[in-house]
A protein has these predicted regions:
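A conserved helix-loop-beta module that forms one wall/lid of the active-site cleft
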Residues: 84-150
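Short acidic active-site motifs
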Residues: 54, 126-130, 159
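Phosphate-binding site of ATP-dependent enzymes
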Residues: 157-195
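Short catalytic-loop micro-motif centered on adjacent basic/acidic residues
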Residues: 4-5, 66-69, 119, 153, ...
């Protein structure tokens, strides 16, 4: 059995180790030749991991049985799309990957299904009249980044403006979400998939 792992950061290091313990051959793709997980897989490709055609070609050439990543929701889009294109098994469909990796889509699904969520605005540009409808502190996020990249808590208008501009640069689509801060406990869950 052969697995393609996309992205070579700290979370993927453990994934690669787990796959190797299960005697699964591993192929790692990452845009950084010196990524942290570089030494672990059986084979490594330096490639733009968001280029669907390049990822697909490597998956076909390597005859992988499945494609996987962890802790990277934007990369999950690539995993799901290429898996669907090639008819490979995947733990998430492309539409579901879109729903969880786009914060605006996710918020809309929450509202449609009456799942409590914070008050928010989707902003194409910085509109202080719209923002005045929300209560500080505010959380500013790129709509489509991952690993808390660009997520900042703004206590003042000055911080909000700076964080908005930062989030807009980080967002691949240029979209930014601003939402009211909610004090609470964050819970993370790690699972092992049975292969």
């Amino acid at each position: 059995m052969k697995a393609m792992v996309i992205a070579g950061g700290v979370p993927q290091m453990e994934l690669l180790r787990q796959l190797k313990e299960r005697k699964i051959e591993t192929v790692l793709l990452d845009g950084n030749e010196n990524c942290l997980a570089r030494a672990i897989p059986d084979k490594f490709y330096k490639v733009n991991i968001f280029n669907i055609e390049d990822v697909k070609k490597i998956a076909v050439d390597e005859k992988v049985d499945f494609i996987i990543t962890v802790c990277a929701d934007q990369v999950l889009l690539v995993v799901a799309e290429v898996s669907e294109m090639l008819g490979l098994p995947c733990y998430i469909g492309y539409k579901q990957a879109q729903d969880v990796s786009d914060k605006i889509r996710m918020k809309k699904i929450f509202k449609e299904n009456k799942i409590p969520t914070t008050k928010y605005l989707e902003l194409e540009s910085l509109d202080m009249n719209e923002i005045a409808k929300l209560n500080y502190p505010l959380v500013v996020k790129p709509v489509d980044a991952y690993s808390s990249k660009g997520v900042r808590k703004a206590e003042t208008e000055k911080e909000l403006i700076a964080y908005y501009n930062e989030a807009k640069k980080i967002s691949r689509s240029g979209g930014v979400i601003v939402e009211e801060f909610f004090e609470g406990e964050e819970i993370s869950l790690t699972t092992n998939l049975p292969f």
